[in-house]
Each structure stands twice: as structure tokens, then as C-alpha cells.
């Protein structure tokens, strides 16, 4: 069970060939095939755990500015095998970084105990997946203005702190 009485460190494993944060260190793609490097994933995860991570977060769709959406099957192929490997190797809270209900469902079945959603469970079916999960997962609701492909074009706030606070307050009320 996730305890938030003190700060918790989350290690991020981006299983994407176009990640903005790790330069696609853990995954490669050519025109016909996507693959992740199992040894690199396990090495990086072990390093994060040694460094104090209490959660390992696995993402298969980049949300960097300008990123294109990833088909559901591709996101599943990127994330579920990694979650299964991590579950077999580590006794740690696993998180799925997704906004896609089908990926949430498969990830929870594969051992994830936290849903980390940059779209704050706004996609159709997302709230229901979390609500109906056999073991109630923790949820991390995040804020994103617009969509990755266009977020830099429509970026505008009158009061960023007030608007993000209000958005998250409403999302919490709606998902409770």
C-alpha cells in the first residue's frame, strides 16, 4: 500500500523510441519492429531501486511536445512485457503511465498497483477501469493542457497555479 506521509521517489522507465527524457535509452524502433532491451531495463530498474525509488513507473507513449499518439496494441506491446519482467524481479510498487483504458486494465492485471495518468482519467472508460479493478490501485492524476501533438500551439493560462489546482480539484471530485 502506498504511504504518502513522507516524500516518495518514483523511477521512470520510458519504453518509447521517442522519449524526451532518456533519449530512447531503453527502446529502439525501426520501420518494421519495436523492441526493448531487457537487460538495460533490468539494470536501470535495479539502479533506481538502489538509489531509493519506491515505485517503478512504466510508460509506452511519449507525451513530449509534438509527440504523435500511439496505437493501443503498440502501447500494450511496449509496456506489458516490461511490467511482467519487473514484477518477476522486484518486490516494489509498479506504476503504469497511460491514459488508455485498455492499457490500464492489462497493466493492472500484470501487477501494476498505480495508474499514472497525464490526462487525469478523462478518457472514456478510464475511471471505470480504475473503479472496477480487483485490487484498488493508487492513482496519480496529472494535468496537461491540450494534446502532446499540439500542446505548444495552444499553451495559455491566466493563472497557472489557480487553473491547475482547480482542474485537479474537479478531477479528484469526479473520480472519488
Region annotations inferred by a language model:
Residues 13, 48, 52, 97, ...:
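Conserved, mostly hydrophobic/aromatic
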Residues 5-9, 53-54, 90-92, 111-113, ...:
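Short, well-ordered coil/turn segments that N-cap beta-strands
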Residues 15-22, 63-64, 110, 118-176:
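Conserved anion-binding
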Residues 19-26, 54-81:
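Glycine-rich, proline-tolerant flexible connector loops at the mouths of alpha/beta enzymes
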Residues 21-47, 74-77, 120, 124, ...:
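Glycine-rich anion/phosphate-binding loops
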Residues 68-96, 102-105, 132-144, 166:
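Alpha-helix-loop-beta-strand connector modules within alpha/beta enzyme cores
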Residues 1-20:
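N-terminal amphipathic alpha-helix/helix-capping segment at the start of soluble metabolic enzymes
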Residues 13, 94-102, 119-121:
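Glycine-rich beta-to-alpha transition loops that act as phosphate-gripper elements at the mouths
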Amino acid at each position: 500500500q502506498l504511504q504518502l506521509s513522507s516524500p516518495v521517489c518514483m523511477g521512470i522507465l520510458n519504453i518509447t523510441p521517442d522519449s524526451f527524457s532518456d533519449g530512447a535509452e531503453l527502446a529502439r524502433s525501426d520501420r518494421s519492429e519495436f523492441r526493448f532491451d531487457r537487460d538495460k531495463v533490468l539494470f536501470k530498474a535495479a539502479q533506481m531501486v538502489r538509489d531509493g525509488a519506491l515505485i517503478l513507473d512504466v510508460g509506452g507513449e511519449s507525451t513530449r511536445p509534438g509527440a504523435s499518439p500511439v496505437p493501443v496494441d503498440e502501447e500494450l506491446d511496449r509496456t506489458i512485457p516490461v511490467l511482467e519482467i519487473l514484477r518477476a524481479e522486484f518486490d516494489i510498487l509498479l506504476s503504469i503511465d497511460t491514459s488508455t483504458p485498455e492499457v490500464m486494465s492489462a497493466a493492472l492485471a500484470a501487477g501494476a498497483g498505480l495508474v499514472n495518468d497525464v490526462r487525469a482519467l478523462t478518457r472514456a472508460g478510464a475511471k471505470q477501469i480504475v473503479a472496477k479493478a480487483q485490487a484498488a490501485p493508487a492513482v496519480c492524476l496529472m494535468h496537461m493542457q491540450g494534446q502532446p501533438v499540439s500542446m505548444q500551439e495552444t499553451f495559455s493560462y491566466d493563472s497557472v497555479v489557480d487553473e491547475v489546482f482547480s482542474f485537479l480539484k474537479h478531477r479528484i471530485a469526479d473520480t472519488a
